[in-house]
Amino acid sequence: MEIIPAIDMQGGRCVRLYQGDFQRVTVYDDDPVAVAHRWVAQGAPRLHLVDLDGARSGHPVHTDIIRAIVQSVDAPVQLGGGLRSIAAVERALELGVQRVILGTAAVHDPELIRQLVQQFGDAIAIAVDARNDMAATAGWTETAAISAIDLVERMAALGVRRVIYTDIARDGTLSEPNIATTRALVRPGGPAIIASGGISTIDHLRRLAEVGVEGAIVGRALYTGDLSLSDALAAVQ
């Protein structure tokens, strides 16, 4: 199971939101590139970048920072936030991002997802962000009329091979991940599942590994020191 540090960017800084609320933001560093270097130096196998301003505006905003990270770290990068067109996905991949993550488009434009999967295959991942088990869109500011489980099934039917599942109510809270829903999403022959939201202890990571997820994205717990990356990596070897 991969342990993937999250780097959420807002206004050029590295931040964390509480339950996806843009009004409840904590700034952890003014230099996301330096943060990326720190996590990779500590052994991160991959980085999870989120362009929060992009998620709200509908188009990537932190392009220069993303490019600087991709060009200067020796680890693959996945990127989400504001990627809602073929052109936006192509631009992200041209930056050197290995994997792009689409969320809003998965709900509102499944035909786009089908085309992207046909064209880019494993480079496409879907963010299934859920509030009260219903999918959220537009930077988590809107709730759609489809459940997380149904959305994953819909994406699987389109050929999607990887889903990042986040329980918004737990994100940034240091509480615990939603093990029950995560378990329901992990199915033989289904998309690989990467878990996110509320992961803050070694026990959480071990429970997720038992469920069978491909990876776990850790954010606030790494920044507060509640969880050390080296301990997390060692726990799932």
UniProtKB/Swiss-Prot annotation:
GO biological process: L-histidine biosynthetic process; L-tryptophan biosynthetic process
Name the record gives this protein: 1-(5-phosphoribosyl)-5-[(5-phosphoribosylamino)methylideneamino] imidazole-4-carboxamide isomerase
A GO molecular-function descriptor: 1-(5-phosphoribosyl)-5-[(5-phosphoribosylamino)methylideneamino]imidazole-4-carboxamide isomerase activity
CDD domains assigned: HisA
Gene name per UniProt: hisA
Subcellular location: Cytoplasm
GO cellular component term of the entry, any: cytoplasm
EC number: 5.3.1.16
Gene3D superfamilies named in the record: Aldolase class I
Family designation: Belongs to the HisA/HisF family.
Keywords from the UniProt entry: Amino-acid biosynthesis, Cytoplasm, Histidine biosynthesis, Isomerase
Keyword Isomerase (UniProt): yes
Xref: InterPro entries: Aldolase_TIM (IPR013785), His_biosynth (IPR006062), HisA_bact_arch (IPR006063), Isoase_HisA-like (IPR044524), Isoase_HisA-like_bact (IPR023016), RibuloseP-bd_barrel (IPR011060)
